[in-house]
Amino acid sequence: MSHYDVLVEGAGPAGATAAYYLAKQGKKVALVDRAKFPREKACGGGLCVHIEEFDHIISNWDDFLESKCLRGIVYGPEFTPVDYVSEKPFFYNIRRLKFDNTLVEYAVAEGATLIEGIAVKSFEVNEDNVVTKLRNGDELTSDVIIGAGGSFDMVSRRIREIENMPMKWRDEDIATALYFEVEVGREYMDR
């Protein structure tokens, strides 16, 4: 059974970033995700300008940056448009396929161990450590577990149980996302 200082469940931006900084500090980190990277993600393709504070990310962002948003149109209650134009970006458009994979690669380069394509089945917090069982039957131990796999990862589920919070989404809280990529000519993007 392998032991880690920290096990991070979920290798999306939050999990990969946590793994990166922990590994950079010399911690032995397991980064576990049910998906294999690179993988598509249908949400979160916009980064706020605060991403500029992370030098290790923006120094290589040509790998994942698609475009900068310098203009936006917002419509009011009477459908009156308000046009915002700026020389500085409002936000950056990225491809999650490339961005998430880049963050995972940064974490691995700092020494994190990536365990991909296997979901966390359960975990048990003991006096001495955390025992995490993976869906393939493997068991890992760690001093700490971080839940970064979304609102229903195993850590979030445990917190919901402890705090007596609902375990299922209500029908009115559920939405469907459709991801479709359309080729748009440069002449339309620069308007």
Where are these regions (language model features)?
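Short, well-ordered alpha-helix to beta-strand connector turns
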Residues: Y4, G26, S142-D143
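Conserved Rossmann-like nucleotide-cofactor binding loop
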Residues: A14, F37, F152
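Glycine-rich FAD pyrophosphate-binding loop
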Residues: Y20-C43
